[in-house]
Amino acid sequence: MGEIFSEQSLNVQTVSDGVTASTTAQANGVSVGVTNADAAVTSNQDNQGVVYGHSVVDVAASAGASSAVRTTAVGNAAALSASNGTISAFAVQTNSAGVTARGQVEAATAEAADLTVSTLAMGNSAGVTLDNGSAGARISQSTTANVLADGGAIVGYVSGTSAVTATTAGNNINVTGANQSAVRAITDQANTADVTQASKFTAYGNSYMTATAATATGNNLAVSNDGPLADVAAHQWNTSYVRGQAEGTSYLFGAAQTTAYAAGNSARSTMSGPKSCSTTFRPIRAAASRRPPASAGTRAMTR
């Protein structure tokens, strides 16, 4: 597969309502949903091409009342859903090429009221959504290439709220059930990339409320179900160097928050209602044990 690029650049002088920029780069995607029916799914996704998504918004004077810049890059994506039905699935996702999402706002001499800059990068992502449904799934994910979400914002004056976030996962699985759903699943996640990184950098002249956050996870599994059964066996293997880096500065500010989070393996489950829940985790190696590569931590605010 060849390289996949999705880029856009907006040059704004002055706008009243706001600016919206959305950029998505994705190599492979599959979506299967059933309503009042049953389905059996077999999916094999293999990405070998670089995936790159980039958004740049330049503002000379004013970004207006509410602006949003969203950038997403994903190697392989799968979405499975059942409403009043049953879905059985066998899904394999393999990513062996770099995935990068970069979103930035350049407004050093401009003002903005409310601003949102969100950047998401994932090597493999799979989701199972149920509404009074049931699912039996075997999902295997493997990524061997670097995954990066990066960028930031430079703004002269923020009169409202500015939220700038970066989220990265080598492998990601979300299982969500509602209205008396039931699920049985076996998940395997292996991340052997050199680097899995989320980084955001912000600089403000004057600001009212700001939040800068970076979240990086080698392998992530989240299970949430409202129903009688959730039986999940999870196996996670990570040898990647995982880095979360967030930096924020403001000359004058009302309230400012900067958070950074990094984890080699993460597994969370939330259950409600009568249930039987069995979850087994097998983390083999955490990323923190590795030394950072020479290129890790470099800023990427330049184009």
Swiss-Prot record:
Q: For this UniProt record, give its keywords in alphabetical order, as a comma-separated list.
A: Cell adhesion, Cell outer membrane, Membrane
* Gene Ontology CC, one term: cell outer membrane
What are the cysteine partners in each disulfide bond? none
- Ranges of compositional bias, category Polar residues: 266-281
Its GO biological process terms?
cell adhesion
Keyword Nuclease recorded:
no
The annotated topology with respect to the bilayer is: Peripheral membrane protein
Q: Where in the cell is it found?
A: Cell outer membrane
* Main subcellular localisation: membrane
Q: Where is the composition biased (Low complexity)?
A: 282-303
Q: Where is this region: Disordered?
A: 266-303
UniProt function note: Involved in attachment of the holdfast to the cell. The holdfast is a structure that allows the bacteria to firmly adhere to surfaces.
Q: What is this protein called?
A: Holdfast attachment protein D
Organism in which the protein naturally occurs: Caulobacter vibrioides (strain ATCC 19089 / CIP 103742 / CB 15) (Caulobacter crescentus)
Name of encoding gene: hfaD
